């Protein structure tokens, strides 16, 4: 009886996820829907400055800066690199990339200052960039916040600005397509995107009538005046999941938009499982608000949603097997659009229960790291709330 009840509950969960959560699993919110059909060209193109925080990004910075300076944007566009105390020549490589394109005049490099207490490193670098922009005689209408490990197709900025102006948006974000080269990436990356969309249904984010908010930190175009009106980045200074925090901050003031894209790609490789593990462990517990009760609830929810269906289908027998099998089948159906977006077979969906178990383990490890004062580890810093030190000893 208990087994049948658990299997039936898991089936109801998957029916809800497929039908009642913004149809997130279909991945319909794409960048090609950003600009409404028939939208005319802008009579005046707003001024834009890209702010790129970078800390020891020698492997990717040249490609990132090069792709930004190669944008076909008709208006005035400049790039500000905030070098967050890099020791690997990040700034020099950025200059070389700009020089190769004859665009040194459109690249400015700001040397970041020491990270103060209460701030995460990325947000402190972004804030320094914003302060520098505000001190200029001619300030931009939009700021494009870009990670240093992102590359852009030439038309991305034009699309972002046209969409923002046509729809009256104050934040437009595109989720960079992650790598799927290594075995670890092929098995874990699509699930990461799937889980993110489940937590933050893009259709709900894009609906001004809903409170759900989020963004993808690699590529975020923000109206400068709205950011100032919202209180600036200081309002979210300690947020590990800074993109979603910024999305929530801006949505309280004006509409926002988030979409999948293949025009913005991540340059950061995750060659093995340990690399992806570190990425998830860094911020998973922050997603739960550093709450032990939420952690317990999340673990139980993951077990019920992802492990109970195959467990009942394969091992329970009797009346529990059918609802378990149906729930597992719906799980595969829901995961298939994400797998296809990443060019993978729907058969990978059969392994989603095991992949979910791995991510659950990462989440528990994230909580354990936080309890030991090692939360939010990134680029030699421990940045989570309660971390025992900002810099690694």
Can you say where each PLM-predicted feature lies in the sequence?
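Catalytic donor/gating beta->alpha subdomain of glycosyltransferases that bind UDP-sugars
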Residues: 164-198, 225-228, 233-295, 376, ...
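Acidic donor-binding segment of Leloir-type glycosyltransferases
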Residues: 65-115
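N-terminal membrane-anchoring/stem segments of glycan-assembly enzymes
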Residues: 1-42, 189-190, 202
């Amino acid at each position: 009886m208990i087994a049948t009840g658990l299997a039936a509950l898991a089936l109801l969960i998957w029916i809800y996820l497929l039908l009642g959560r913004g149809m997130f699993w279909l991945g319909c919110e794409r960048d090609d829907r950003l600009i409404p059909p028939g939208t005319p060209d802008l009579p005046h193109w707003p001024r834009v400055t890209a702010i790129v925080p970078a800390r020891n990004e020698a492997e990717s910075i040249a490609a990132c800066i090069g792709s930004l300076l190669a944008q076909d944007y008709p208006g005035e566009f400049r790039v500000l690199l905030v070098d967050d105390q890099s020791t690997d020549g990040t700034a020099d490589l950025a200059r070389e990339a700009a020089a190769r394109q004859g665009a040194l005049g459109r690249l400015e490099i700001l040397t970041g200052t020491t990270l103060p207490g209460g701030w995460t490193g990325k947000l402190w670098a972004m804030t320094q960039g914003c302060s520098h922009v505000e001190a200029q005689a001619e300030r931009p209408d939009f700021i494009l916040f870009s990670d240093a490990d992102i590359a852009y197709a030439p038309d991305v900025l034009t699309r972002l600005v046209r969409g923002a102006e046509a729809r009256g948006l104050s934040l437009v974000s595109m989720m960079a397509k992650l790598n799927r080269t290594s075995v670890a990436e092929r098995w874990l990356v699509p699930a990461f995107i799937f889980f993110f969309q489940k937590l933050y249904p893009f259709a709900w984010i894009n609906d001004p009538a809903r409170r759900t908010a989020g963004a993808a930190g690699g590529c975020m175009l923000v109206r400068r005046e709205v950011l100032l009106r919202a209180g600036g980045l200081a309002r979210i200074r300690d947020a590990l999941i800074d993109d979603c925090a910024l999305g929530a901050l801006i949505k309280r003031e004006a509409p926002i938009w988030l979409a999948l894209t293949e025009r913005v790609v991540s340059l950061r490789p995750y060659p093995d499982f340990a690399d992806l593990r570190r990425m998830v462990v860094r911020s998973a517990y922050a997603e739960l608000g550093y709450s032990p009760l939420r952690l317990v609830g999340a673990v139980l929810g993951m077990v019920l949603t992802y492990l109970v269906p195959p467990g009942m289908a394969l091992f329970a027998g009797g009346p529990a097997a059918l609802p378990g099998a149906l729930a597992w089948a719906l799980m595969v159906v829901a995961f298939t659009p994400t797998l296809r977006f990443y060019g993978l077979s729907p058969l990978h969906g059969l392994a989603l229960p095991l992949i979910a178990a791995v991510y659950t383990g990462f989440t528990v490890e994230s909580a354990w790291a936080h309890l030991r004062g090692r939360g939010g580890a990134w680029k030699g810093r421990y940045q989570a709330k309660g971390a025992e030190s900002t810099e690694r000893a």
